[in-house]
Curated annotation (Swiss-Prot):
Specificity for association with VLDL: annotated segments: 278-290
InterPro entries from the UniProt entry: ApoA_E, Apolipoprotein_A1/A4/E
Gene3D superfamilies: Apolipoprotein
Protein name per UniProt: Apolipoprotein E
Residue positions the entry lists as glycosylated: T212
Length: 317
């Protein structure tokens, strides 16, 4: 695809200098080489190539072109191709900006500013081409029925100059995009280096551990088992000693708690007996007094009842 496109561009550049009635010398060979050098097949470059191919057709100034120039079809086609080119260019720029994330902010801002300037120049020159064609269409319409040979020659000259400017703009844009891409590659390499620096100590530690395990694997199995048994025995003895010490501490604490509880129970019993004796000393006089009063009241009631039941003397005797 790239070879076919390069061949198409060479053919286009070779025919861009043709006039309608008089032959014109072809473009210099260095300019052809310049275009084929930067043409790398990126989507935005392919879109720009389609724009140039359409411009080459316009530069022939054939009868069909002249008829379509009197309408708005040519400018509409150029507008579509311009929009397509700028859209692909923005997409490619966004892709490179994502790859530039590891690069320093200052560097990324500078590269982005330079690329935007080159992109703006390319867009302005493409707009200039369309403006020239619109101007030519207006002049042709104003000169209907008159000779337009001089006007066509002037338009052809303007279009050749604009094509050279577009070629320079595209070359500059391609170079800046290459710088952009190189910056993205450099940032990615720095990110990989940083990861390598962080992982280096971990890899070294793993290597040391592997060497230690390898040296242990070289010992006889019986010696390693004996060493592990001794370490396990020492560990078990240490745990047993700590457990016994802890049990002794718990026993002492339980004995202390029991003694405190017995002491508190005895104190509570003594306090209850004292309180009971105090209550008894308070209420016994009251009870005895109430008993005496009750006995006196009972005697009075009995005396009153006996007096009311005595026989009354009769007056009939």
């Amino acid at each position: 695809m790239k070879v076919l496109w390069a061949a198409l561009l060479v053919t286009f550049l070779a025919g861009c200098q043709a006039k309608v009635e008089q032959p014109v010398e072809s473009e210099p060979e260095p300019e052809l080489r310049q275009q084929t050098e930067w043409q790398s097949g990126q989507p935005w470059e392919l879109a720009l190539g389609r724009f140039w191919d359409y411009l080459r057709w316009v530069q022939t100034l054939s009868e069909q072109v002249q008829e379509e120039l009197l309408s708005s079809q040519v400018t509409q086609e150029l507008t579509t191709l311009m929009d397509e080119t700028m859209k692909e260019l923005k997409a490619y720029k966004s892709e490179l900006e994502e790859q530039l994330s590891p690069v320093a902010e200052e560097t990324r801002a500078r590269l982005s500013k330079e690329l935007q300037a080159a992109q703006a120049r390319l867009g302005a020159d493409m707009e200039d081409v369309r403006s020239r064609l619109v101007q030519y269409r207006g002049e042709v319409q104003a000169m209907l029925g008159q000779s337009t040979e001089e006007l066509r020659a002037r338009l052809a000259s303007h279009l050749r100059k604009l094509r050279k400017r577009l070629l320079r703009d595209a070359d500059d844009l391609q170079k800046r995009l290459a710088v952009y891409q190189a910056g993205a590659r450099e940032g990615a390499e720095r990110g990989v280096s940083a990861i390598r620096e962080r992982l280096g100590p971990l890899v070294e530690q793993g290597r040391v551990r592997a060497a230690t395990v390898g040296s242990l694997a070289g010992q006889p199995l019986q010696e390693r088992a004996q060493a592990w048994g001794e370490r396990l025995r020492a560990r078990m003895e240490e745990v047993g000693s700590r457990t016994r010490d802890r049990l002794d501490e718990v026993k002492e604490q339980v004995a202390e708690v029991r003694a405190k509880l017995e002491e508190q129970a005895q104190q509570i019993s003594l306090q209850a007996e004292a309180f009971q004796a105090r209550l008894k000393s308070w209420f016994e006089p009251l009870v005895e007094d109430m008993q005496r009063q009750w006995a006196g009241l009972v005697e009075k009631v009995q005396a009153a009842v006996g007096a009311s039941t005595a026989p009354v003397p009769s007056d009939n005797h």
